[in-house]
């Protein structure tokens, strides 16, 4: 009895609804194509974040008319990412539709905005909508939520997606108005469930003439469909293509956990970057610092979290930044006692130009996360701090204009692209794996290698980045941004920024510098950088190879003071000094004795007072140096000879009147020999040099950092000329013995 009694109560409003729908002749009264100005986009945004601005920019690109509801209001619709909710959107739409309910020729497109971009224009949307021959079309989804128990109530779909997605729908204004008039719930109730229950009710579905966009012709929900969609470049345009249905959806929705994929698509759509024209948004909303009277104040955060090679050069490069020093303040965290001397030298130099310098040393015993929180807060708490520029010690900023370039891009968070030399290792990730770690995006290699140049919205960046001070005092006003669960500090920062809806960008519009490797950095030597030829070859070359080395091949500066004795620059002053220091620090000079356990047979016929490279662990480095820098010179001066770049004897010789002042005539046990002067005649010693007896030719003024190269056995009998006072050092290798 109860059931039979309930039927009339349910049927009466449904009959009224059907009668109302029959009275509307929207489809018949709108012959031909609907004009673009008859489409109104409605969205809800109680705040304006980066996602909202991206949505509005894409709408502006296609000349959509957009009405934003809820601006300035408190959001009471729940946490849509982690729970049901969203009812506030329905209420706001219900209120707004009272104004449009009678406009039978008006089409309403309701969509999310924080995680949506348009890929096509109003004409395309309306054309596709009209072809459905329905009054309301909802986005379709392959996933059923929030109530999986309703699956059986959905109409069967043979091709396409079966379930409703409330993130986007389009329909004639009277039908949309009547649909949302059904809402009588609370703001924190679920909008998805509300629309679902309307759709799965056969009578209501018929009354409202609702269908789903089963093949994603208009709406593309990315959640559950990431393997269906690809980026498509064609005819100067960038589109998202659904490869399952061969469609080009117009509104792309990064619902659920797919916001990172949407950010990737948003780097290209709508025509943000194309193969023909490159980056279309790079110069939009930028700042021209040349027109600014007072330069923005920048807090430069420097972080030395592990023993780092080439640190003095890193610090000195910070002082070469093309930015007014009076607008800089420094925050330095140094975790390593090993680097305290480098910091002191740097601060003594920097304090003359930079008035505010805060140093947090190893005695504070701060974790990396605590130190980074402190550095960021140093800017956050200073109302005059316009930007926070964080730089790790493993970043080599070779472009002095880096800071200016980043400021002028005018993004909340932006990082310059830096990579390891010759590798794909960089300071950003283009995608994330399901567990939140590195995954390679389709465009990662092209961005790293500079095949695609622009400003890229990415899920992770580290090592060096710029954050606007006003962002730290608004969206990111919490102090503890570098601690989250068990994540590394850099991952915690990026996770927090993503959750706050703050976009992070990477720029590869310029060459900014590179990353160095801190792996395998052994600090047991006196001058540890000398061992970095394998890990950081570019930095090693810059520090230790003579600046004129390249002129050997471009300007033919090789000299020939004696027949087949070639003379050329090879080492920098620093290389010479550090090699001598390293040998003296080791201190176990051989004394120039004939009996020598270091060599095969234990006897040296022409002994020198020396230390072998092998004794200080430098042998492999030295042999690599020979192959990389000596071998090319060999090919130039000894045409047709290809060296193996191998030497059994590599050593530094020490000449002094007190120990060994000269060396008697001899042939070297080599195909050819190199002899590099490590200090200056006239300054460090008097006398010395080398005489080639067969040619009666002497070289008495060796140049520091320059090498002799001459044949070894048979032709070039030679002797070491006496040192009169001081100490002379040379580095020698018997190559291809």
Swiss-Prot record:
Catalyzed reactions: L-lysyl-[collagen] + 2-oxoglutarate + O2 = (5R)-5-hydroxy-L-lysyl-[collagen] + succinate + CO2
Expression (tissue specificity): Is highly expressed in the heart, lung, kidney, eye, ovary and placenta.
Pfam families listed in its UniProt record: 2OG-FeII_Oxy (PF03171), GT_PLOD (PF25342)
SUPFAM superfamilies for this protein: Nucleotide-diphospho-sugar transferases (SSF53448)
Glycan-carrying positions: 63, 209, 365, 522, 696, 725
Phosphothreonine found at: 320
GO cellular component entries: rough endoplasmic reticulum membrane
Function: Forms hydroxylysine residues in -Xaa-Lys-Gly- sequences in collagens. These hydroxylysines serve as sites of attachment for carbohydrate units and are essential for the stability of the intermolecular collagen cross-links.
Gene responsible for this protein: Plod2
Protein name, UniProt field: Procollagen-lysine,2-oxoglutarate 5-dioxygenase 2
UniProt KW keywords: Dioxygenase, Endoplasmic reticulum, Glycoprotein, Iron, Membrane, Metal-binding, Oxidoreductase, Phosphoprotein, Signal, Vitamin C
Source organism: Mus musculus (Mouse)
Subunit structure: Homodimer.
Protein EC: 1.14.11.4
């Amino acid at each position: 009895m109860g059931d039979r009694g309930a039927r009339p109560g349910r049927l009466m409003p449904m009959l009224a609804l059907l009668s109302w729908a029959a009275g509307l002749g929207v489809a018949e009264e709108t012959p031909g194509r609907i004009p673009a100005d008859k489409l109104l986009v409605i969205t809800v945004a109680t705040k304006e974040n980066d996602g909202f601005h991206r949505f509005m920019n894409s709408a502006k690109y296609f000349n959509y008319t957009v009405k934003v509801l809820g601006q300035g209001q408190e959001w009471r619709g729940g946490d849509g990412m982690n729970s049901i909710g969203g009812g506030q959107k329905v209420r706001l739409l219900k209120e707004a539709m009272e104004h449009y309910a009678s406009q039978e020729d008006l089409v309403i497109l309701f969509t999310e905005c924080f995680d949506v971009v348009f890929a096509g224009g109003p004409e395309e949307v309306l054309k596709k909508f009209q072809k459905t021959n329905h009054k309301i079309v909802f986005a379709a989804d392959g996933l059923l939520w929030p109530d999986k128990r309703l699956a059986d109530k959905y109409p069967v779909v043979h091709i396409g997606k079966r379930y409703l997605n409330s993130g986007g729908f389009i329909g004639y204004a009277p039908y949309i108005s009547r649909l949302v008039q059904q809402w009588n719930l609370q703001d924190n109730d679920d909008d998805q469930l509300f629309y679902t229950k309307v759709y799965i009710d056969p009578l209501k579905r018929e009354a409202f003439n609702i269908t789903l966009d089963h093949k994603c012709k208009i709406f593309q929900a990315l959640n559950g469909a990431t393997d269906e969609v690809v980026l498509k470049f064609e005819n100067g345009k960038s589109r998202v293509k659904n490869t399952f249905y061969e469609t080009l959806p117009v509104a792309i929705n990064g619902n659920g956990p797919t916001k990172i994929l949407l950010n990737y698509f948003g780097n290209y759509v709508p025509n943000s970057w194309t193969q023909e024209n490159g980056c279309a948004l790079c110069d939009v909303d930028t700042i021209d610092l040349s027109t600014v009277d007072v330069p923005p104040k920048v807090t430069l955060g420097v972080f030395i979290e592990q023993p780092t090679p080439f640190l003095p050069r890193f610090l000195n490069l910070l002082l070469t930044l093309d930015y007014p020093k009076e607008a800089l303040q420094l925050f330095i965290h140094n975790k390593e006692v090993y680097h305290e001397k480098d910091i002191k030298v740097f601060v003594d130099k920097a304090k003359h130009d930079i008035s505010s310098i805060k140093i947090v040393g190893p005695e504070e015993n701060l974790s990396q996360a605590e130190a980074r929180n402190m550095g960021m807060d140093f800017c956050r708490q200073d109302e005059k701090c316009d930007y926070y520029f964080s730089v790790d010690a493993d970043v080599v900023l070779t472009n002095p204009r880096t800071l200016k370039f980043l400021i002028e891009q005018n993004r909340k968070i932006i990082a310059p692209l830096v990579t390891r030399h010759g590798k794909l290792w960089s300071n950003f990730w283009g995608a994330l794996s399901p567990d939140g770690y590195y995954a390679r995006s389709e465009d990662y290699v092209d961005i790293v290698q500079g095949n695609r140049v622009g400003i890229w919205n990415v899920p992770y960046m580290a090592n060096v980045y710029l954050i606007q001070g006003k962002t730290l005092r608004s969206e990111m006003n919490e102090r503890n941004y570098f601690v989250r669960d068990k994540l590394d500090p850099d991952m915690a920062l990026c996770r927090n920024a993503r959750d706050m809806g703050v976009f992070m960008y990477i720029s590869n519009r310029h060459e900014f510098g590179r990353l160095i490797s801190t792996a395998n950095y052994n600090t047991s030597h006196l001058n540890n950088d000398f061992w970095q030829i394998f890990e950081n070859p570019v930095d090693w070359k810059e520090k230790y190879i003579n600046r004129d080395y390249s002129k050997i091949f471009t300007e033919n500066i090789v000299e020939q003071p004696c027949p087949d004795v070639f003379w050329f620059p090879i080492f920098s002053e620093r290389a010479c000094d550090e090699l001598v220091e390293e040998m003296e620090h080791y201190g176990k000079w051989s004394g120039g004795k004939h009996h020598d356990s270091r060599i095969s047979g234990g006897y040296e016929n022409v002994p020198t007072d020396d230390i072998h490279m092998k004794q200080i662990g430098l042998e492999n480095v030295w042999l690599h140096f020979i192959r990389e820098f000596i071998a090319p010179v060999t090919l130039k001066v000894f045409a047709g000879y290809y060296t193996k770049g191998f030497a059994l004897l590599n050593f530094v010789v020490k000449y002094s009147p007190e120990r060994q002042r000269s060396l008697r005539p001899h042939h070297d046990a080599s195909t050819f020999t190199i002899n590099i002067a490590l200090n200056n005649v006239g300054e460090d010693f008097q006398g010395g040099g080398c005489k080639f007896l067969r040619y009666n030719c002497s070289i008495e003024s060796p140049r520091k950092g320059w090498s002799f190269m001459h044949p070894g056995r048979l032709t070039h009998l030679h002797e070491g000329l006496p040192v009169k006072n001081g100490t002379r050092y040379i580095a020698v290798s018997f190559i291809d013995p």
